[in-house]
Swiss-Prot record:
The keyword Repressor does not apply. InterPro entries: DUF402, FomD-like_sf, Ntdp-like, SA1684. This is Nucleoside triphosphate/diphosphate phosphatase. It comes from the Bacteria. Keywords: Hydrolase, Magnesium, Metal-binding. It comes from Streptococcus pneumoniae (strain ATCC 700669 / Spain 23F-1). Transmembrane segments: none annotated. Mg(2+) 2 binds at residues 105, 107, 120, 123.
Amino acid sequence: MKLPKEGDFITIQSYKHDGSLHRTWRDTMVLKTTENAIIGVNDHTLVTESDGRRWVTREPAIVYFHKKYWFNIIAMIRDNGTSYYCNVASPYYLDEEALKYIDYDLDVKIFTDGEKRLLDVEEYERHKRKMNYSDDLDYILKEHVKILVDWINNGRGPFSEAYVNIWYKRYVELKNR
């Protein structure tokens, strides 16, 4: 699969462990691709839920996906600062159709004031039983929550204000071409 280039638009598809489609984002603009990572932006992007409901993202958001980490990061740029929504998820896979990953329910939300919350623990436990997550998978996911929290606490990558500013500026430049 040929990597998308800066300024290209891609579709993102989130699946559940049982293979069912969970959510789709249309027209995410690619800002950078490397061998292991894709950085993009959603801005008034159409999102379709598995039940057919549709909505549009409200604010620009820098999205970060990696082939080695079991999480992805959404930095939502708001008037009062940046908030984050982090999905504990499989490393991404890219094919001709979309960037794809498996969503494993656990989420970390960081508010503009820095407060952090681990979300959907009950949903994770329920799906772990229902979809038979292996002990190895459970271990990997929990270890990557620790890695994610370390990134947050140390302002690494997308959790750096400079990172968000650089990629938002690049998005504005590409959008206004």
